[in-house]
A protein has these predicted regions:
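NAD(P)+-binding Rossmann beta1-loop-alpha1 motif at the extreme N-terminus of oxidoreductases
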Residues: 1-39, 59, 94
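Rossmann-fold dinucleotide-binding core
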Residues: 101-137
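Extended, hydrophobic alpha-helical segments in both membrane/secreted and soluble proteins
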Residues: 2-16, 74-77, 84-91, 95, ...
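Conserved strand-to-helix beginnings and helix N-cap segments that scaffold or border functional pockets
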Residues: 30, 84-85, 135
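Buried hydrophobic positions in well-ordered alpha/beta secondary-structure cores of metabolic enzymes
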Residues: 1, 33, 58, 73-76, ...
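A structured beta-alpha segment of the ubiquitous adenosine-cofactor-binding alpha/beta core
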Residues: 40-94
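Hydrophobic/aromatic beta-strand patches that form the interior of the parallel beta-sheet core
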Residues: 17, 59, 74, 124-126
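Short, flexible turn/loop "capping" segments at secondary-structure junctions
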Residues: 10-11, 67, 131-135
Length: 137
């Protein structure tokens, strides 16, 4: 899901930092994005030069501190309240006060997640349906 959100955001012209816990997971995510974009070229939905533009907007990393200056962070980890709270607490420490934190949860309490941070007023639920890159924003 996170890769699809990153892809869609980059397709819309924004720079993206795609974070995962291990470099090999980041690489796998980027490769899935490349494959999805290639399929779009084959189906004549996208031009090859547009693929390069989209990929140039995605920075993959396993270093969470690379998101410290982002305006918006969209979390897309699996549906586990404890894991999500721990992630948002780390992000709350790393990120600038201006940063809006968003959860992609479809089943957990957004209010409870927001209360795990020091910025519940800058916390939102932002759910994407599968497959994010194929949905219109």
């Amino acid at each position: 899901m996170g890769g699809g959100i990153a892809q869609k955001t980059a397709q819309e012209g924004l720079d993206v930092v795609l974070v995962d816990i291990k470099p090999e997971f980041v690489e796998r995510g980027i490769n899935i994005i490349k494959s999805t974009l290639q399929q779009a070229v084959e189906r004549k939905i996208m031009k090859p030069e547009d693929v390069d533009k989209v990929l140039s907007r995605i920075h993959g990393t396993a270093d969470m501190s690379d998101v410290k200056d982002c305006d918006l962070i969209i979390e897309a980890v699996f549906e586990d309240m404890k894991v999500k709270k721990e992630l948002f607490q780390k992000l709350d420490e790393i990120c600038e006060p201006k940063t809006i934190l968003a959860t992609n949860t479809s089943s957990l309490s957004v209010d409870e997640l927001a209360r795990a941070t020091n910025r519940p007023d800058r916390f939102v639920g932002l759910h994407f349906f599968y497959h994010p890159a194929k949905n219109r924003l």
